Amino acid sequence: MEVIRSQKRTVSNDVVSTPTLPLYLTAPHMEVRLEEFELFAIDRLRVLKGVSDGLARARNPNEMDDLVETLWKEHMRLSNVSEMINKDIISHFVLRLVYCRSDELKKWFLSMETALFRHRFRLKKIEEQRAIVGEFGLPYKAVIGAELESLKERLGLVARSHGQISSDVENIYYKVPFEEVPDLVASRRVLLQKGFAFVAGTQLVSLVVTQFRSHLSKALILTNRKWTTTIREREKDRLTPIVEALSTSYLGPDYSQSNEYADISLKDIDQVSKSSFPLCMRHLFEKLREDHHLKHGGRMQLGLFLKGVGLKLDDALAFWREEFTKKVGSERFDKEYAYAIRHNYGKEGKRTDYTPYACSKIITSAPGAGDHHGCPYRHFSEDNLKAALSRMGLSSRGMEDVMDKVRNRHYQLACTLTFEAVYGTSCDTGINHPNQYFEESQKILKSKTPAAPV
């Protein structure tokens, strides 16, 4: 796959003729425009993050099928089938580059791509599923004749024990080494005999997913080797910055400018901090009021958040000045801190209009001693987090639900559950940005406020 700047993409016949559920066994022979390299990857990343959220919410297989179908239509579907397949393949291989770079990234990508493949496979008709099995070149053949007859009674018992009316709709079974289908063995959904599992045609997904995961796991190791030895340095001025940014990309709305739900003033800020700030910003705000100081990381995280919720530059300068001058003089504040505040608002230096930090950036930050920035769900001790959640009014049950997600490293979902517990309403999109939390909170609170009489 060769990335070019902006000319027409040429595609090999092999790519166009790929089945509608590619196996990604080999990289495609095609030229890809630089814009598509990034945009296709972002669209696929939206799908994978949706899958991650669905799994974290413990949705059942049928619900996950529906979710995957919806996510795919929303982010990956194109009117031209061959172009859609190309987008599928390109985006997968781009994200291989993005997520091969550390064990943590590889683990996440491997799990999400495997889950995505599983549910896309489940959505295919049985004939298409068998064709995909053939594409893998698996050596397993259907059990027929006397061997099948001798097993029919026991196969029927296994099937009926899981609610099937007959042993199998198609009466087709595959004889495979039991270690190839660990999930079916663990759930006792297959007949075992002499080291083999007899897998029904309707259970092909388990067999294929094992192969898919094994292949992708090995491929990520090879991709990492190529990335570190050649690609990263060779593409340092072109692809490398895109690849390194994608794994922490925020994919939601732009909160750099305030909107109808984001317009606060100094007189409201203390009350609003208690009613609508997410825990990360509430903690920073309280530490600032308590200590009259925050280190650089905390000032950036809170300052840009306040900018995004509508605090004007003059009010921001007055807010920070009021706190900091309780410990340092006005002259020192103007010299050491005021410039940085104006800089964040695009009034100094390169005049860049800086955007508030998204959850992905906050979670991956590394606060040190004396720092208060970062994500409380990741960086707080369990006792400190429980105390903070208690101050937000969470019940014991709600707190335990949140802590369960924290222990499983689903930090954004933990924040989402906190939001749902505080406001008594669901947040199906999940919390991906502190300013999103604030905006959704304000919508709820303002909807409950009686309209002023005319």
Swiss-Prot record:
GO annotation, biological process: DNA replication, synthesis of primer
Cofactor: [4Fe-4S] cluster
GO cellular component assignments: alpha DNA polymerase:primase complex
Subunit and partners: Heterodimer of a small subunit and a large subunit.
GO-annotated molecular function: 4 iron, 4 sulfur cluster binding; DNA binding; metal ion binding
Protein name: Probable DNA primase large subunit
Pfam family, one: DNA_primase_lrg
Stated role: DNA primase is the polymerase that synthesizes small RNA primers for the Okazaki fragments made during discontinuous DNA replication.
InterPro entries: DNA_primase_lsu_euk, DNA_primase_lsu_euk/arc
Binding site for [4Fe-4S] cluster: C280, C359, C375, C415
Keywords: 4Fe-4S, DNA replication, DNA-binding, Iron, Iron-sulfur, Metal-binding, Primosome
Cofactor: how bound: Binds 1 [4Fe-4S] cluster.
Family label: Belongs to the eukaryotic-type primase large subunit family.
